[in-house]
Amino acid sequence: GKLTLAIEMFKGTYDRSFFHQLISSQLDMDRMDYLNRDSFYTGVAEGNIGAERIIKMLHVVDNQLVVEEKGLLSVENFLVARRLMYWQVYLHKTSICSETMVLKIFERVKDLLKQNIYVDIPKHLAVFFNRNISKEDFQNENMLLQNFVSLDDVDIWYAIKNWQNHNDTVLANLSQNITNRNLFKIKLEVGLKTEGLEANILQNFEAKKIPKSFQK
């Protein structure tokens, strides 16, 4: 059916291979979409890649996706923009700290539930805290997948705001801090640990079969 066809395109087993390149490649539609979207919402101009021009420059030759020569500069700008967005947005210290705090909040909720301590959780979110779910569970239980795709930022923030007033101090403090943007701090470790460093370097040289004349 249609779902089988979509899966074949995504995995690259469909005979028209350019569909896979459009869906999942270094120059796919998803990357163009999220770069423009995230550039708009974060105000980072470097992510504005001119996706419409790139799409107009795309063609299919021998079942492969190709780019017109005059579109190469736009593709180069796309690759540079993606790298800049990772450093300025996705790997920014604020993003990393926020993500870590959300994970710690969820870990704390699971710990409390294991101790039979009540935590108010929205129904379609609770299923992910009450049991350990594997990839196979998603494949075998349609209800799990439906619950997952129904979640959005509003559900997560609603739960976190409720947990600000929980009796557990750890959960309450974490929830209050992320709500009030009092985020974790990144601590940089100064100084290079050199113990065993030379031995590791030599071992890597040997593994890559680099001649000894180049090792010093």
Region locations from a protein language model:
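Histidine-centered, transition-metal-coordinating active-site segments
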Residues: 1-216
